[in-house]
Amino acid sequence: MHFLTEHEYAVVTRCADLMLPPHGDFPGGGVAGTAEYVDRTLGAFDFDPPRIWAGGPYSGRFGGDARFSEFLALSRLEELAWRTRIEGSRGIAEREWNGAVRGWQEVYRDGIAALGAGFLDRDGADQEAALAVVPEFADLLFEHACEACYGAPEYGGNRDLAA
């Protein structure tokens, strides 16, 4: 894991299944790799180059050179924008040119904490009710779950090309 704790990883997995449940051949957002996608995204700057832009132009899955697994270096402005988006402004002047920014890392940490330590022990209806109380977290996780399920597996989701 890169950013999430084991507990946070499990919570993200469960929430992804609540948001994108298994149906037909689709295994659900959890099994499809949402937590891995989120963990890699929130920890993108643990890698060099950061895991933001997969290379290309081909994945190699259907011909061509497999270059998606080779991530591209970011420009100075791209790094600033992505660090601000992921980490928040953190009081750093160059990240606050348009005001303070709450980063995704903080949204996830606060949202998971607000769900409570016993979240995983609740039944599905109680879990859905708990998610409704943290809309900023739930909205961001839903966006990331969709990206994880339908995006390129090199970003950590769409396990076994599930979607």
Give the predicted meaning of each segment.
Residues 4-5, 21, 151, 162:
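Generic, ordered loop/turn and secondary-structure boundary motif
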